[in-house]
Amino acid sequence: MAHQPRWTMSQVTELFNKPLIDLLFEAQQIHRQHFDPRQVQVSTLLSIKTGACPEDCKYCPQSARYKTGLEAERLMEVEQVLESARQAKNAGSTRFCMGAAWKNPNDRDMPYLEQMVKGVKALGLESCMTLGTLTDSQAQRLAEAGLDYYNHNLDTSPEFYGNIITTRTYQERLDTLDKVRDAGIKVCSGGIVGLGESVKDRAGLLLQLANLPTPPESVPINMLVKVKGTPLADNDDVDAFDFIRTIAIARIMMPTSYVRLSAGREQMNEQTQAMCFMAGANSIFYGCKLLTTPNPEEDKDLQLFRKLGINPQQTAVLEGDNEQQQRLEQALLTPDTEEYYNAAAL
């Protein structure tokens, strides 16, 4: 792989100061050079272990330190996870992500996690996990099980990070990304807009991500979901244009990465989401629950896709657009009655 040129803070700052209309044009041009602008990759996120997390991430309702009304749950049984994966596939998802609310997995959990990965892969889905800090051996075991992606967000800039989290250092996050990459697993890493950070901090986050030895294959950009009981519950709302600008700059700086709309889509209207797609977003989380917060209902996503002329990216088993659209529509006629998408924010 050719060496990636490193971005400088002055270059990123220049992008943040660029007129939005010009920025969107540049981002869309770059997007079309590397992706089909009418295709969006669809992922489903499941919380395989919910609540009682010992970390103090100020945005997260899963932290045991905050009273958010969330009930803790043990690690799910493997077959429960695989049944959720089957339903996700039937609803049109091509990637199944599994998140656990803890600082790091215990070695006793690894056999179950490996079985989950193998089972998801056997269904023809891409697999992704977000489990916190990993050791070298844990990363290798997940790789040998066939894990495609590992999510571990940087959240914000190194300078602002200490205002949000104190139980895990920024360097720990970078080290985990290195271990995942060394094990041969693709990297999923992004951050959150709306933590109280400055524009310079948003630039710093994207600078860190784009200047990794190999940029993440997948970059989730979250809009803060303010949950009562967390320290950030009263933060100011994120301006939609500021969020769209962040998406566009992520696309420009990481032209071959999937840029994913993650937490916060529920509070975005159709116009904001449409502009995010125009800015270069080409992946979404799809399902009933994201984090322990709402995600747009599947039928609303399908309606928006139709309005914009967007098609969900095809599954691993090749099929025509019409066939996939019909299958997706049929799945949406039977709304999900189990809250198995009660997942941790990525």
Curated annotation (Swiss-Prot):
Q: Name one GO biological process term.
A: biotin biosynthetic process
All copies of domain Radical SAM core, residue ranges: 38-256
Q: Which SMART domains match?
A: BATS, Elp3
* Co-factor requirement: [4Fe-4S] cluster; [2Fe-2S] cluster
Which residues are connected by disulfide bridges in this protein?
A: none
Task: Give the first-level EC class, as a single word.
Answer: transferase
Note whether Transcription occurs among the keywords: no
Task: Give the cofactor note.
Answer: Binds 1 [4Fe-4S] cluster. The cluster is coordinated with 3 cysteines and an exchangeable S-adenosyl-L-methionine.
Give the matching InterPro entries. Answer: Aldolase_TIM, BATS_dom, Biotin_synth/BioAB, Biotin_synthase, Elp3/MiaA/NifB-like_rSAM, rSAM
Keywords for this entry?
Answer: 2Fe-2S, 4Fe-4S, Biotin biosynthesis, Iron, Iron-sulfur, Metal-binding, S-adenosyl-L-methionine, Transferase
Sites binding [2Fe-2S] cluster sit at C97, C128, C188, R260
- One MF term in the entry's GO annotations: iron ion binding
Give the range the annotation lists for the signal sequence. Answer: none
**Any idea which positions bind [4Fe-4S] cluster?**
C53, C57, C60
Question: Which pathway is this protein assigned to?
Answer: Cofactor biosynthesis; biotin biosynthesis; biotin from 7,8-diaminononanoate: step 2/2
As recorded in UniProt, its EC number(s) are 2.8.1.6
Reaction catalysed?
(4R,5S)-dethiobiotin + (sulfur carrier)-SH + 2 reduced [2Fe-2S]-[ferredoxin] + 2 S-adenosyl-L-methionine = (sulfur carrier)-H + biotin + 2 5'-deoxyadenosine + 2 L-methionine + 2 oxidized [2Fe-2S]-[ferredoxin]
HAMAP family reported in the protein's UniProt record: BioB
**Subunit structure as annotated in this protein's UniProt entry:** Homodimer.
NCBIfam families found in the cross-reference section: bioB (TIGR00433)
Concerning its family, UniProt says:
Belongs to the radical SAM superfamily. Biotin synthase family.
Tell me the protein's name. Answer: Biotin synthase
Recorded source organism is Klebsiella pneumoniae subsp. pneumoniae (strain ATCC 700721 / MGH 78578)
Gene name of the record: bioB
